[in-house]
Amino acid sequence: MPEAPDRAIRTLDLFAGAGGLTTGLSLAPGLEVDAVCAVEFDLSAAATYTLNHGGRIEDGRVVGGSVYAGSIQDWLHEVEPVEVDLVVGGPPCQGFSTLGKQNVDDDRNFLWRRYAEAVKRSTPRYFVLENVPAFLTSPQWDVFQDELESGMLADYGIEVDILNAADYGAAQARKRVIVMGHHKDFPAPGLPTTTHEHQHRTLDEIFQDIPNTVDRVGLPEGTVTYGGVDRPGAFATRELHFGRFYTDLSLKRFASIPEKGNRFDLPDELLAPCWRKHRTGTADVMGRLHLDKPSVTIRTEFFKPEKGRYLHPTEDRAITHYEAALIQGFPENYQWVGTREEIARQIGNAVPIQLGTAIGRRLQKAFSGSLEIRDETQASRVA
């Protein structure tokens, strides 16, 4: 096991994305996070992570930080093991809804194995694994439990539940599996305590200071170099309040949808042919967000109203990247690198900041207790 840290908690962030989980953890009172290493395959997301966690722009290049910009498989093969106090990450588990059409042993469906391997070799006191609710009913979950019983994670116990980010202060009803793992030499941290279960934050709180009108289409100008490639950026969150070009038909549809409405409110002449044939189905498609409720889950294509309930509550447009980032809890000055689609993916894949902070509060208490236990154990051995 690594030595007890003097102050900062040495953290390894896997499948790190834009850094939402680490950012949330770092905002927990009393928990000082030292992100000693992050692993991220998407280079634009890696650049975003770098700029917000130890990196900087120097002569137009993103430099510094401690991000391995590549696959976790390559990282495990190329990099010497790093001992840390905490491992966090959300391994992508693809194909839950179509496993019958896929090889269930496809490595893409078992990237969490690489996560488990990283835990085994990094020997953290604690780990946090985030995933979609379907993880708990997948073959991957069964194998994960086998690893806990007698495999790579046999030295660890876990606590697990499906948590709603809205219960922890996010203005978003986003449900995710959270697995809190602890080495058996140290106490279980417990799952986060809800703070807003009976009083969810609403979109009105998020949107009240944002201009309703959008007078720009597309990203601002500017590029930075990362990985030897020029990429759009870096942009502060507040610079992401831009729209997109809509067809006249789309604008007519938006104008016909009332507050809290959706595609079922459209007159017949504005319905797409597929909607005429299918009068049932989800009410979220082409739906307006509700000002008096949390947002629905922000996904990676939130800028497309046909993908879900992503129309602005009152304006005839989809929500902007700026609005989506604020719903996810990102700070106004967070720095972003990438194309419109890449930044949307970074925003949509992130762990809501408030949920990360709630997890951090539990870990802070656990680390405080575990450090005391660790010190007493060392003292008795010395004696």
Language-model regions, residue ranges each:
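Short Gly/aromatic-enriched secondary-structure transition segments
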Residues: 52, 194-197, 313-315
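Extracellular structured ligand-interaction cores
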Residues: 8, 174-176, 293-295
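Core alpha/beta nucleotide-donor-binding catalytic domains of modification enzymes
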Residues: 2-123, 133-137, 141-146
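Class I S-adenosyl-L-methionine
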Residues: 75-84, 96-278
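Short, hydrophobic/aliphatic alpha-helical segments
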Residues: 3-4, 153, 332-337
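Short glycine-rich anion-binding loops that position phosphate/pyrophosphate groups of nucleotides
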Residues: 91-94, 184-185, 303
